[in-house]
A protein has these predicted regions:
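Short polybasic/polar patches that bind polyanions
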Residues: 21, 182, 204
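Conserved G/P- and acidic residue-centered "switch" motifs that form tight phosphate/ATP-binding loops
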Residues: 10, 171, 205
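Short beta-strand(s) of the beta-wing in winged-helix/HTH DNA-binding folds
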Residues: 54-57, 162, 209
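An amphipathic, aromatic/His-enriched active-site/gating alpha helix that lines ligand/cofactor pockets
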Residues: 44, 202, 208
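GST-like fold's C-terminal all-alpha helical module
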Residues: 103-201
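GST-like domain detector, emphasizing the conserved glutathione-binding G-site
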Residues: 1-132
Length: 210
């Protein structure tokens, strides 16, 4: 059986949980307490030297530590329902929008949080090394996040889902982005009706509660 090293409160492993839920796959869930620093323990470093979550242990015992790799692996083994696209153009659009949601959205929210929260002092970046906060990066992250919500709203004004006509990994990443942005008090605006309607639809999917 698959094993997932997880932290329920963190956005990154939630992406994996939602992907697994959409695929209908069973797995063993092992919690890593980030508040207590368990990701930095010697025991966990042996599993994932990068000291991050998620880590997915495959059925043959190999460790996958990045959402991009995890989703590619699971899609290859379990192609239905397709979350990475089926045609060359679908695959391209989904990959592009997933990257935009990650880099333009999730990274902006993380930049804002990790460079401002007192609880993350000297933890401005995930991983084994302590990195000092840079307050200006928090300010920039908030601005980028607001801009990206406008981009999402524009895209969803013409498409049912982020990357087109079908639900995909881009919708998983986008859903978690909107939820994670609340941590830094950034929300979709009232006039971003397409984004708000899309997020309401996403909350109705069973995988939302994964």
């Amino acid at each position: 059986m698959l094993k997932l090293y997880d932290c329920t409160s963190a956005p990154s492993p939630r992406r994996t949980r939602m992907f697994l839920a959409e695929k209908g796959l069973d797995y063993e869930n092992i919690q890593v307490d980030l508040e207590k620093g368990e990701q930095l323990s010697e025991a966990y470093r042996k599993i994932n030297p990068g000291c991050t979550v998620p880590t997915l242990i495959t059925e043959d015992g190999q460790a996958l530590t990045e959402n991009a790799g995890i989703s590619a692996y699971l899609e290859a083994l379990h192609p239905e329902p397709a979350l990475l696209g089926t045609t060359p153009m679908e695959k391209a659009n989904i990959a592009a929008w997933n990257w935009r949601c990650e880099m333009g959205g999730l990274m902006s929210a993380a930049e804002a949080l990790r460079n401002s929260s007192p609880r993350m002092k000297d933890r401005a970046l995930p991983g084994p090394k302590n990195i000092p906060q840079i307050p200006e990066l928090a300010e920039r992250g908030l601005m980028k996040l607001g801009w990206f919500f406008k981009t999402m709203n524009r895209q969803l004004s013409y498409n049912e889902f982020i990357a087109g006509d079908s639900y995909s990994v881009a919708d998983i990443t986008g859903t978690i982005l909107v939820d994670f942005a609340r941590w830094v008090k950034v929300y979709p605006q009232e006039d971003q009706t397409a984004l708000l309607a899309w997020h309401a639809r996403m909350k109705e999917r069973p995988s939302y509660k994964a």
